[in-house]
């Protein structure tokens, strides 16, 4: 059983609270979203957030999850397979400008020919709210990682942070494809 320092335990509690809020929001927003694609995206990300919450609970209980890093990589691999295939096709077609981003090609967010419908405006609001959450949570993990003495704990938290960044990429890609980014 691992004994966390007071600071480490406090950081884990903070991260747990953030993950709990993410789980609740993704579940609620999956119900509120109008677009079936967005409902599925929210539900999928929400499931990942449940795993993050379980990991943090285990850590708070003094258990070091043994497979967390591998599970994160496997989950990201499964979620990212379609994106990687599409990215490969894009690279073959010579598309540029997405260096460092493994998300699929999206149109210029400022090039929407029609205004957003009221339903799309509501979906855009949900996406913007969750994107802001993902940015905040990812930054929280980034700061927290450096406060842990255990390399294994840092690795686990780093894996979760990477997943949070991927969620942000997925939300951005959806928003940009639907003319919602900057709307």
What are these regions (language model features)?
Residues 1, 63, 105-109, 116, ...:
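Long, compositionally biased, intrinsically disordered segments
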Residues 2-62:
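N-terminal leader and targeting sequences that precede the mature domain
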Residues 1-2, 183:
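Absolute protein N-terminus
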Residues 151-165, 169, 173, 182:
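Intrinsically disordered, compositionally biased tail regions
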């Amino acid at each position: 059983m691992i004994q966390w320092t007071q600071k480490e335990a406090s950081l884990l509690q903070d991260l747990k609270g953030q993950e709990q809020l993410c789980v609740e929001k993704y579940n609620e927003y999956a119900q509120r979203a109008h677009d079936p694609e967005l409902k599925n995206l929210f539900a999928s990300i929400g499931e990942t957030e449940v795993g993050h919450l379980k990991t943090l609970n285990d850590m708070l209980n003094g258990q070091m999850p043994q497979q967390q890093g591998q599970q994160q990589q496997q989950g990201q691999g499964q979620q990212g397979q379609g994106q990687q295939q599409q990215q490969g096709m894009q690279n073959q077609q010579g598309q540029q400008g997405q260096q460092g981003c493994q998300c699929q090609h999206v149109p210029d967010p400022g090039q929407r020919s029609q205004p957003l419908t009221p339903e799309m405006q509501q979906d855009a609001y949900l996406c913007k709210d969750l994107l802001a959450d993902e940015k905040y949570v990812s930054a929280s993990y980034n700061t927290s990682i450096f406060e842990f003495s255990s390399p294994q704990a840092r690795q686990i938290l780093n894996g979760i942070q990477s997943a949070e960044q991927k969620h942000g990429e997925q939300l951005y890609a959806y928003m940009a494809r639907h003319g919602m980014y900057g709307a």
